[in-house]
Amino acid sequence: MPTINQLVRKPRQKVVAKSKVPALESCPQKRGVCTRVYTTTPKKPNSALRKVAKVRLTNGYEVISYIGGEGHNLQEHSVVLLRGGRVKDLPGVRYHMVRGSLDTAGVKDRKQARSKYGAKRPKAA
């Protein structure tokens, strides 16, 4: 415990909150161009081929982003929109693609949680 005199000389430091998504620079989303689209394997105990892309953002950052949903149409030079949100079992993946925006197509035949995957409302039968 510091003495009152020590606190008068040097007050307590505020704890500075560190951003979980620094590349977005306090923006809700950022645009970027895919430089590499590939699959990677998750940490133990999970097993899959997760679809990810390396993206160069408009501010110069190069980040890895997760492509959610079943199937995608992305390739190198696709223009995409990124949002924050990490993938717990993929180290280094701190961003998600926004499906149904720019060059990223929405998920086909998606019935539930459609707004998260850029899927239009299905026609009533």
Swiss-Prot record:
Entry's transmembrane regions: none
UniProt feature, compositional bias: Basic residues: 113-125
A GO biological-process term: translation
Domain of life: Bacteria
Pfam families according to UniProt: Ribosom_S12_S23
Key words, A-Z: Methylation, Ribonucleoprotein, Ribosomal protein, RNA-binding, rRNA-binding, tRNA-binding
SUPFAM superfamilies: Nucleic acid-binding proteins
GO cellular component: small ribosomal subunit
GO molecular function terms noted in the UniProt entry: rRNA binding; structural constituent of ribosome; tRNA binding
Location of region: Disordered: 105-125
Residues carrying 3-methylthioaspartic acid: D89
Assembly with partners or alone: Part of the 30S ribosomal subunit. Contacts proteins S8 and S17. May interact with IF1 in the 30S initiation complex.
Family annotation (HAMAP family): Ribosomal_uS12_B
Protein task: With S4 and S5 plays an important role in translational accuracy. Interacts with and stabilizes bases of the 16S rRNA that are involved in tRNA selection in the A site and with the mRNA backbone. Located at the interface of the 30S and 50S subunits, it traverses the body of the 30S subunit contacting proteins on the other side and probably holding the rRNA structure together. The combined cluster of proteins S8, S12 and S17 appears to hold together the shoulder and platform of the 30S subunit.
Similarity section: Belongs to the universal ribosomal protein uS12 family.
Name of protein: Small ribosomal subunit protein uS12
Naturally occurring in which organism (per UniProt): Methylobacillus flagellatus (strain ATCC 51484 / DSM 6875 / VKM B-1610 / KT)
Source species taxonomy: Bacteria, Pseudomonadati, Pseudomonadota, Betaproteobacteria, Nitrosomonadales
Gene: rpsL
